[in-house]
C-alpha cells in the first residue's frame, strides 16, 4: 500500500510542476464533495471521510453529490451522519441482501422482461428510507422538504434518464417533489441487475443507474451560483466557449436574466475508485497502459466493453480535474462483489485513508502549487 501511495505522490508532484500557478488561499476551501459510483468498493469512502473529519474539512462542507454507491454516501453525509456512523453502517450491511429476488424463477423472469432488471431493488430503497428517517423522522421526505428545514447539507444525486438519453440531477432546485429515497434507488439501479424505475418526477420516463452516463459528476457544481467565494473560480478555455454560446443565445432571445456562467469550481473535492494502474495512467501522461491479449470472441467482447466503460468514465473530464480529485485504489475489488469479506472491507477503508492522506499531503506542501 505504501508503495502505491508514494507512486501517486510522485506523479502528483511531477504533474503540478508543469501546471499553472494559482492564487494562494487558506489551508482548505472545500465546500462541495462528489462521490463516484463503485458499488461495494464505496466502503473505501469510510476511510476518506475519517481523514476529512480529522482535518476539519467535513464540518465545512455545504453540498454533497454522488452516483450509485456514491449516492448512498452522499445522502448519509448530507443528513449529518458522522464518519464513524457511516463506517458502522457500511460495515454492518450484508450486501447480499441487495440481491432481493422473488424466490421464484418465473417471477424474476417476468420482472426482468417488464421492469428490465432481475432484482427488485426494494431492499436498498427501504434501507435508505430507514437511514433518512433516523435523521429527519420522515423516511419519505422530499428534496424540498429537506431543504426547507435548513439544517442539512444540500444533496445532489445522479441518475440516467433512458427516455431522453441524458443524465438527470436530482436536487431540491431541480426535482423538489422527488423523495430522496427514490432518487437514491434510481442512482444505484445497475441496468439489468436491478429493476429500472419508471414514472418518477411526474413523467413516464425510465430511469437507471446514474453511473451509466455520469459516474463521476465532478463538474456538477461548476456554475457561478455555486461559489461561496469568487476567488475560488478558475476561468478555463473549455468553459469560455460554452459561456460565449450561452451569452449569444441570451442576446438573441433578449433575456434579462443574468447568465449563470460555467466556472472551474476549486471548492469542489471529488473521490474516485479505480485500480492502481488506472490511477497511474490517468495522472501520468507518460505512463504506458498494459495491453490486453485479444485472441477470441470472448476476449474481444470483454476488451470492447471495458474500453467503452473507461471512455464513459473519463470522456467528460479535463486535464485539470485531477487537481480536485482524490483517487482511491479499489484493490481489484468489483462493484458487485457482494460476498466481500471483512478483511477486504478493512483493506478498502485503509486504502481510502491512505490515498486521502496522500492527496492532502500534496495539497498542503508549500513547495508545490496545488489547486488553491
Segments and roles (model prediction):
Residues 1-65, 75-372:
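Patatin-like phospholipase
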Residues 66, 70:
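Gly/Ala-rich beta-loop-alpha elbow adjacent to hydrolase catalytic centers
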Amino acid at each position: 500500500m505504501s508503495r502505491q501511495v508514494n507512486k501517486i505522490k510522485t506523479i502528483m508532484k511531477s504533474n503540478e510542476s508543469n501546471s499553472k500557478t494559482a492564487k494562494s488561499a487558506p489551508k482548505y476551501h472545500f465546500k462541495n464533495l462528489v462521490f463516484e459510483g463503485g458499488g461495494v468498493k464505496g466502503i473505501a469512502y469510510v476511510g476518506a471521510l475519517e481523514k476529512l473529519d480529522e482535518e476539519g474539512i467535513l464540518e465545512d462542507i455545504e453540498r454533497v453529490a454522488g452516483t450509485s454507491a456514491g449516492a448512498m454516501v452522499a445522502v448519509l453525509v448530507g443528513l449529518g451522519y458522522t464518519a464513524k456512523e457511516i463506517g458502522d453502517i457500511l460495515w454492518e450491511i450484508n450486501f447480499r441482501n441487495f440481491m432481493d429476488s422473488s424466490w421464484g424463477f418465473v417471477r424474476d423472469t417476468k420482472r426482468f422482461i417488464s421492469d428490465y432488471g432481475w432484482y427488485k431493488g426494494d431492499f436498498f430503497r427501504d434501507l435508505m428510507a430507514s437511514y433518512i428517517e433516523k435523521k429527519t423522522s420522515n423516511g419519505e421526505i422530499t428534496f424540498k422538504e429537506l431543504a426547507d428545514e435548513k439544517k442539512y447539507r444540500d444533496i445532489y444525486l445522479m441518475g440516467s434518464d433512458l427516455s431522453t438519453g441524458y443524465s438527470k440531477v436530482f436536487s431540491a432546485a431541480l426535482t423538489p417533489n422527488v423523495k430522496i429515497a427514490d432518487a437514491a434507488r434510481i442512482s444505484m439501479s445497475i441496468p439489468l441487475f436491478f429493476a429500472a424505475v419508471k414514472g418518477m418526477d411526474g413523467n413516464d420516463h425510465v430511469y437507471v443507474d446514474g453511473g451509466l452516463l455520469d459516474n463521476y459528476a465532478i463538474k456538477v457544481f461548476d456554475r457561478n451560483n455555486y461559489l461561496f467565494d469568487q476567488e475560488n473560480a478558475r476561468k478555463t478555455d473549455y468553459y469560455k466557449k460554452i459561456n460565449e454560446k450561452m451569452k449569444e443565445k441570451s442576446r438573441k432571445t433578449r433575456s434579462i436574466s443574468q447568465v449563470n456562467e460555467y466556472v472551474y469550481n476549486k471548492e469542489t473535492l471529488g473521490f474516485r475508485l479505480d485500480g492502481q494502474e488506472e490511477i497511474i495512467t490517468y495522472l501520468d501522461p507518460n505512463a504506458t497502459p498494459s495491453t490486453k491479449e485479444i485472441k477470441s470472441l470472448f476476449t474481444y467482447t470483454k476488451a470492447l466493453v471495458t474500453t467503452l466503460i473507461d471512455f464513459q468514465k473519463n470522456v467528460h473530464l479535463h486535464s485539470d480535474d485531477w487537481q480536485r480529485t482524490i483517487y482511491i485504489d479499489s484493490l481489484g475489488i468489483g462493484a458487485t462483489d457482494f460476498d466481500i469479506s471483512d478483511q477486504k472491507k478493512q483493506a478498502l477503508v485503509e486504502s481510502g485513508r491512505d490515498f486521502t492522506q496522500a492527496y492532502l499531503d500534496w495539497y498542503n506542501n508549500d513547495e508545490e502549487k496545488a489547486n488553491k
